[in-house]
């Protein structure tokens, strides 16, 4: 079994992946980083959080090998579903979760993250977001990915804001989805470690920064906010973020 932890960029996907991964590890699953090493998947599962990238046949079939050999592990992605990915999900070989956020806050966070990366001289996935329009188009692409995952009935859908404000309830939903027992003593320290108030911004792979709901209202000017409302409006209403 492969647990596929998918997330909108800058929507707590690193936080959610590590929570999911550590819950599974505490329940007897395999360490994905060891799977990556043992099965020579360094070119498939990249970065600290074992990101598979696009769900292409080559990548999916590569990670399917250790799964079919009896290994249970968690991988991360930001990409949308594909025909083969959807087939494997329907067959129960992949169990997907998807976390998303108010795209206005996610867009702001991506722009700021890219700016910090450029200032450090260390390009990252957001370095190209050098202006408002580029960031807007970037987020529109990920809203289409959000739409595709919301159509996946087998996926567990989670809002980042709900993780921040009702962590226990959202963790219970995740545990139920994974088939784990909350009363398992091994899981208690994991759940505690990832509480929003306990999360450390410097924790490797967590990518936890401001974590403030509605921060775009104070950081973007009125014209920019109106553009976001006009562009994202149809999505915002369906996502539950319509003012």
Language-model features: locations:
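PAPS-dependent sulfotransferase catalytic domain
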Residues: 1-153, 158, 226, 230-241
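The conserved 3'-phosphoadenosine-5'-phosphosulfate
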Residues: 30-51, 74, 151-222, 226, ...
């Amino acid at each position: 079994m492969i647990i596929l932890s998918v997330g909108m960029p800058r929507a707590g996907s690193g936080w959610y992946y590590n929570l999911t991964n550590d819950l599974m590890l505490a329940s007897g699953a395999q360490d994905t980083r060891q799977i990556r090493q043992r099965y020579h998947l360094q070119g498939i599962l990249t970065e600290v959080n074992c990101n598979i990238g696009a769900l292409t046949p080559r990548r999916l079939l590569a990670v399917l090998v250790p799964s079919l050999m009896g290994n249970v592990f968690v991988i991360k992605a930001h990409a949308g579903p594909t025909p083969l990915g959807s087939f494997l999900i329907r067959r129960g070989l992949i169990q997907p979760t998807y976390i998303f956020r108010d795209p206005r806050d996610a867009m702001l966070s991506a722009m700021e993250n890219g700016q910090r990366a450029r200032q450090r001289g260390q390009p990252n996935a957001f370095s190209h977001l050098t202006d408002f329009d580029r960031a807007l188009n970037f987020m529109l692409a990920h809203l289409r990915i959000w739409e595709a995952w919301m159509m996946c009935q087998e996926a567990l859908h989670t809002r980042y804001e709900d993780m921040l404000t009702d962590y226990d309830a959202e963790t219970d939903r995740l545990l139920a989805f994974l088939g784990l027992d909350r009363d398992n003593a091994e899981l208690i320290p994991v759940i505690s470690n990832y509480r929003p108030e306990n999360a450390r911004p410097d924790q490797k792979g967590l990518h936890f920064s401001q974590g403030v709901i509605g921060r775009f209202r104070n950081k973007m000017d009125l014209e920019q906010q109106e553009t976001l409302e006009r562009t994202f409006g149809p999505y915002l209403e369906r996502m539950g973020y319509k003012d």
